[in-house]
């Protein structure tokens, strides 16, 4: 787990993603959710920016509860994401240096839940995490996930 009192010591990597979120829930959160779920899991930090030196810095979310409600709405909407694998314990408002952020801990999806994808098309909406980025999976990788999960005989 991260030491939130020393957030500036962390960098984005294959398990940490910072998102500004001052203008609302970023659309790119779904790619990161899919990528973390289909990889080793990770933590999304809403209300955190990555500075030029790559260090992380807490912003101050004006209404973090609204962001959480928006996130839950998307997680429960099959038009947004194929499956919700989060529990209420995975999402939390934290205060860092007097600033409110939201942490979203995304566990790795169980093999029989994979792939976790955006929208209705697993071939176009499945992502994996590599380094600091979320990358769309190739159709071959998606079909392999589906075979492993028992979702198709492709």
Language-model regions: role of each:
Residues 1-154:
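Conserved N-terminal catalytic/coupling substructures associated with nucleotide/phosphate chemistry
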